[in-house]
Structures are given as C-alpha cells and as structure tokens.
C-alpha cells in the first residue's frame, strides 16, 4: 500500500505547535524564576530580621555563630565579606574575623621556630584562647578556620591540611604536594615517621620516601633524630604533643613584637 507523503501544511502545523510549546516553556521558566527570586528575597529579609534580633548571641556564642553562617551560606550571603555592608555594620563580624586573623598570625609567628610553620588546629585554638583572656569574646575552631580561609585568600602563605580527624595549619609559603600531605597524615599517630614506615604503609620506593622527608627537613617542618633506635626518626614538631602545653614565652612574644 502506497504511503502518502507529509504535506507542507502538516509540517507548518507541527512547527507552529513546537513554537507554542517552546513559548509556553519559556513563560513557565520565567514565572518559576520570578517566584524563586521572590522567595529568596523574603528569606534574605527574614535572615536580616533574625540577625538584628539575635546579634548579641551571634557575636558571643560560637555554636550559634556557626549555625548562622550555615544559614547565610544557603542563600549565598557572606557575612565575612569586607567593606561596610549591612552584615559588617550590624554584626561587627568583619572586625571580629579581622582581629582574629591578626591574632592567628601573631601566634603562628611566635611559634614558628618551634614547629617550622605547621601547627595543629587544636594547639592554635588553645594558644589563641590564652592570648584573648577570659573576658574576651569566645572563639571556636570553626571561627579559626573561617579566619584562616580569609588569610589564605590574601595570599599570605596560610593553608589548611586535613590530618586524621583534625587539621594542620600551614603559616609559611612552603610548597607541599600530595606526597608531603600523606606523610604528614602518617606521622599524626606518633608525631614522627621513618623511611621504613613510609615504605610499608604507602608502598613507596626508598628514594621517593627520602625525597619527601628531605623536603620537610629543608623547609624546617621536620626534625631529624639520628640517635633513635633502629633507624632515623623524622619528627614533626607540629604533631609533637609535648610542645602543646607550653605557653608562648616572653622571649617568643618579643620576636613578634620587638
């Protein structure tokens, strides 16, 4: 049986229908976008009212501050943005994180000769709290991380390295690649690492392990102990817990503030 070809009229009708569907889809998308924008504006207004009402608690309570920061992040608001915008004027968070950043730099500089420019987040938190005094605004580890990220954005050499269940804060512009990072993670348990331990745990060749350790020594991030039993131990002072309890001495403070 002979099939009839599709006529010009049918083609035109089909194109017209497609155009109408496309137009309708565009209208629906625009309506949906307008509705989402309206909801976002309403959420932002409610967030501003919430911040105004609870600003004292946001300033004083670290846990409350974290929750507020997370609420802001859901709509792309950055309360830490510099400048004299609504958030910095209302909450004073711009000044808070600027001052915290300065204090972080002071602590890292004072302890650099001990740890080579690497410090655990826990020790940094401990030293910052000691420096602030008991009447100062409380600070959480989350606050420290946010302040460090701001410092990192300024190109100051600061970085955050995940190690086990915590972080190492890097305050010197040393080049650390993935090999260096995994060795730091391996040393987290005992505070030191050996060539044999690296080879056994990471399945590396001897030369690769030695290159990484030599780099850490060169950058001042590791100490070499040739008197250790068995073979040389490479200590990571940032992970050497006996140093944590030592407060910043007057001499160390003078190195930062001559």
Swiss-Prot record:
Keywords: Coiled coil, Cytoplasm, Endosome, Membrane, Methylation, Nucleus, Protein transport, Transcription, Transcription regulation, Transport. Transmembrane segments: none annotated. Pfam families: EAP30. GO terms for biological process: early endosome to late endosome transport; endocytic recycling; macroautophagy; multivesicular body assembly; multivesicular body sorting pathway; positive regulation of exosomal secretion; positive regulation of gene expression; positive regulation of protein catabolic process. GO terms for molecular function: channel regulator activity; lipid binding; protein homodimerization activity. Residues 27-53 form a coiled coil. SUPFAM superfamilies: Winged helix' DNA-binding domain. The modification Omega-N-methylarginine is found at residue 4. InterPro entries: ESCRT-2_cplx_Snf8 (IPR016689), Snf8/Vps36 (IPR040608), WH-like_DNA-bd_sf (IPR036388), WH_DNA-bd_sf (IPR036390). Its main location: cytoplasm. It is found in: Cytoplasm; Endosome membrane; Nucleus; Late endosome membrane. One of its GO terms (cellular component) is nucleoplasm. Signal peptide: none annotated. Required for degradation of both endocytosed EGF and EGFR, but not for the EGFR ligand-mediated internalization. Component of the endosomal sorting complex required for transport II (ESCRT-II), which is required for multivesicular body (MVB) formation and sorting of endosomal cargo proteins into MVBs, and plays a role in autophagy. The MVB pathway mediates delivery of transmembrane proteins into the lumen of the lysosome for degradation. The ESCRT-II complex is probably involved in the recruitment of the ESCRT-III complex. Interacts with TSG101 (via the C-terminal domain). Interacts with RILPL1 (via the N-terminal domain); which recruits ESCRT-II to the endosome membranes. Interacts with 14-3-3 proteins. Component of the endosomal sorting complex required for transport II (ESCRT-II), composed of SNF8, VPS25 and VPS36. SNF8 is essential for the stability of the ESCRT-II complex. ESCRT-II interacts with ELL. Belongs to the SNF8 family. This is Vacuolar-sorting protein SNF8. It comes from Rattus norvegicus.
